[in-house]
Amino acid sequence: MQVPKNDVYTVSRLNGEVRQLLEGQLGRIWLTGEISNFSSPSSGHWYLTLKDSHSQLRCAMFKGRNTTVAFKPINGQQVLVRGSISVYEPRGDYQLLIEAMFPAGDGLLAAQFEALKMKLAAEGLFAQDTKRPLPESIQRIGVITSPTGAAIRDVLHVLKRRDPSVEVVIYPTAVQGTGADKDIIRAIELANQRLEVDVLLLTRGGGSLEDLWCFNSEALAHAIYNSTLTIVSAVGHEVDTSIADFVADVRAPTPSAGAELLSGDQSHKQQKLAGALARLTQGWRHYALKRHSGLISLQSRLDRQDPKRQLQQQSQRLDELELRLTSSIQRRLSSHTLTTERLKARLERHSPAQRLMMEQQRLTYLDERLKGAMEDRLEDAQTHLGGLSHSLASVSPLATLSRGYSITRDAGGRVLTQASSMKTGDTIETQLEQGSLLARVIEIKPE
């Protein structure tokens, strides 16, 4: 049988292509599981296994990433992690490289929120061109909220102060707890059936992510999107953001701000200004969402090509060698100690007192030499490991930055090697050991 040379893989080539395939196809993922086999060697990296009732997966979280974790992981703890699948090529093992870790609970809600936001954005529910404008003239406002909460009091107070002529129709609903999202959906559908108001204000006061969870319902998002009436979302405090905020035609940071947005102070000019500001805010949110998605994609590409990945692989290998060396030395020391004890016992059984004393002195001398030899061996091994670590650091492309060199890239992030590839007026970025410089080309000098 003739085997084509180009079809024969080496083990290293196969492991490398499997790593590229996994990293390119899966990208970043969220994963939940129970911690086991947690270890933290002297390098500062974390190694652990995440498991459930049927499967387990090896994981690594390198120093620099794990410093952002607000708690110390322990075996048996349920966690939620974000990371990327990779292959540890020396062994051919696939593993998860963890970037962020949270205790199971709030972290799971946050992950569900991000997943739903990405899904609805892909479906077009956040698209700016589908937003309904605020009416030119607002005479009657429908308020969807709890009739006994602080939000309705704030809204009524602002409307009375700014424009007492505006009428208010309250659609009472639950705004927290199981089934609250269904109540809100029914209120939106009722208002669209009656068509008795010019605009709807969906609002409630602030609270935790769990308190506001009913506003992150996929069904509610579609109800807001399908509404004939313009909907203004004013949920929580300024720092709170919900799915309803992204789908609504206009988002106000607080209930009071929503009321101010819909009240005109008797001025048509202010109404137009408020509408323009609201559209600008939505446009910025849409732009920021697109930029965020682009940055995530770029970060994933950088992670796959980052030379730090090779350093991490070598650092992980050094950790394994350190553990194996320590274990080997301990086994040899235990073996020699056991042999010494056996010889001592034989001498005690068969030798007279004087011979026993001489042999005991000899054994003591041999024991000291043995310990000295083992200590010398351990010191040599540690020196060798230090040399390997120093050699690894010296070949890092980033090490040249500490010697005064720099790396210059064009606006697209490509490394520049020829001045002729740029034009006068182009923007370039120069990376130094600490920080970077953004500059513009004013003159190009040939070689």
Curated annotation (Swiss-Prot):
Catalyzed reaction equations: Exonucleolytic cleavage in either 5'- to 3'- or 3'- to 5'-direction to yield nucleoside 5'-phosphates
Sequence similarity: Belongs to the XseA family.
Broad class of where this protein is predominantly found: cytoplasm
Assigned EC number: 3.1.11.6
Record CDD domains: ExoVII_LU_OBF (cd04489)
GO molecular function: exodeoxyribonuclease VII activity; nucleic acid binding
Enzyme class, broadest EC rank: hydrolase
Organism the protein comes from: Shewanella amazonensis (strain ATCC BAA-1098 / SB2B)
GO biological process annotation, one example: DNA catabolic process
Signal sequence region: none
Compartment(s) where it occurs, according to its Swiss-Prot or TrEMBL record: Cytoplasm
Record's function text: Bidirectionally degrades single-stranded DNA into large acid-insoluble oligonucleotides, which are then degraded further into small acid-soluble oligonucleotides.
Record's protein name: Exodeoxyribonuclease 7 large subunit
Protein keywords: Cytoplasm, Exonuclease, Hydrolase, Nuclease
A Pfam family annotated for this UniProt entry: Exonuc_VII_L
GO (cellular component) term, any one: exodeoxyribonuclease VII complex
Gene: xseA
Assembly, per entry: Heterooligomer composed of large and small subunits.
Disulfide bridge map: none
